[in-house]
Amino acid sequence: MSFYESVFIIRQDVSLNDIDKIVDDFAKIIKDNNGTIIKKEYWGLRTLAYKIGNNKKGHYYFLGLDITGNVKEELERKMKLNENIIRFLTIQADSISSEPSPILKNQSTENTPVIDVTINN
């Protein structure tokens, strides 16, 4: 198994409950294939660098994963098929840090609340 970091952007009009359902669907795929979610972070509703479709903002979500390449391909296939996900990127990593990501560190200096950070070791 290999480490992967995946970030996906969900449409701005999707509720937090629906975002949780999307992440739970991905978690089920990962666990059913003997993978592990090492870290997950909700980065909040952020302004996009450029408009994507009718979206000027998006909900950003990060997953740190320990999975096989086949599971990565299945996750990316599901992300492509999900109409609520407007962009995603998954890269292979050497390791997954247990520290909060730099984006969350920057958010803590702002007035934006952090809704979900989970680290599994």
Curated annotation (Swiss-Prot):
GO terms for molecular function: small ribosomal subunit rRNA binding; structural constituent of ribosome. Keywords: Ribonucleoprotein, Ribosomal protein, RNA-binding, rRNA-binding. It holds the Pfam family Ribosomal_S6. One of its GO terms (biological process) is translation. Gene3D superfamilies: 3.30.70.60. SUPFAM superfamilies: Ribosomal protein S6. GO terms for cellular component: cytoplasm; ribonucleoprotein complex; ribosome. Belongs to the bacterial ribosomal protein bS6 family. Binds together with bS18 to 16S ribosomal RNA. This is Small ribosomal subunit protein bS6. It comes from Rickettsia conorii (strain ATCC VR-613 / Malish 7).
